[in-house]
Amino acid sequence: MPPKKKIAALVKVQLQAGAATPAPPVGTALGPHGVNIMEFCKAYNAQTESMRGNVIPVEITIYEDRSFTFITKTPPAAELIKKAAGLQKGSGVPHKEKVGKLTKDQVREIAQTKLPDLNANDIEAAMKIVEGTARSMGVTTD
């Protein structure tokens, strides 16, 4: 078994799927660690090509020898809620001013998408988490 690489840093960024460029935020996040930014952009874009149009969080593990690995997550719940409700952004005063509405089916669909990344055992618990996020954005659920 080869010796384990020592981890130098863990960087988390949210990027448009299939559209990462060496410009900020990628360059500013990876530059100080001496990682080949173009190499990361190519690998990330290739892996997220099928999810274009979504914001995809990525966790980049940078090792001491300047190599890296990355894990893509599911899109943020807030992004999925905005897309489902057809909104540009959430409410500025969420508990007073409601800006949209989601059906139970839409909430279930979002929860299904987010389930691998959520700390929930079943779809019902995941739906409650998504409903809470929607509430804090000023979106009502039936």
From Swiss-Prot:
<keyword id="KW-0694">RNA-binding</keyword>
<dbReference type="GO" id="GO:0006412">
    <property type="term" value="P:translation"/>
</dbReference>
<comment type="function">
    <text>Forms part of the ribosomal stalk which helps the ribosome interact with GTP-bound translation factors.</text>
</comment>
<keyword id="KW-0687">Ribonucleoprotein</keyword>
<dbReference type="InterPro" id="IPR020784">
    <property type="entry name" value="Ribosomal_uL11_N"/>
</dbReference>
<dbReference type="InterPro" id="IPR000911">
    <property type="entry name" value="Ribosomal_uL11"/>
</dbReference>
<protein>
    <recommendedName>
        <fullName>Large ribosomal subunit protein uL11</fullName>
    </recommendedName>
</protein>
<comment type="subunit">
    <text>Part of the ribosomal stalk of the 50S ribosomal subunit. Interacts with L10 and the large rRNA to form the base of the stalk. L10 forms an elongated spine to which L12 dimers bind in a sequential fashion forming a multimeric L10(L12)X complex.</text>
</comment>
<keyword id="KW-0689">Ribosomal protein</keyword>
<dbReference type="Pfam" id="PF03946">
    <property type="entry name" value="Ribosomal_L11_N"/>
</dbReference>
<dbReference type="GO" id="GO:0070180">
    <property type="term" value="F:large ribosomal subunit rRNA binding"/>
</dbReference>
<dbReference type="InterPro" id="IPR036796">
    <property type="entry name" value="Ribosomal_uL11_N_sf"/>
</dbReference>
<dbReference type="Pfam" id="PF00298">
    <property type="entry name" value="Ribosomal_L11"/>
</dbReference>
<dbReference type="GO" id="GO:0022625">
    <property type="term" value="C:cytosolic large ribosomal subunit"/>
</dbReference>
<dbReference type="InterPro" id="IPR006519">
    <property type="entry name" value="Ribosomal_uL11_bac-typ"/>
</dbReference>
<dbReference type="InterPro" id="IPR020783">
    <property type="entry name" value="Ribosomal_uL11_C"/>
</dbReference>
<comment type="similarity">
    <text>Belongs to the universal ribosomal protein uL11 family.</text>
</comment>
<keyword id="KW-0699">rRNA-binding</keyword>
<dbReference type="GO" id="GO:0003735">
    <property type="term" value="F:structural constituent of ribosome"/>
</dbReference>
<dbReference type="InterPro" id="IPR036769">
    <property type="entry name" value="Ribosomal_uL11_C_sf"/>
</dbReference>
<keyword id="KW-0488">Methylation</keyword>
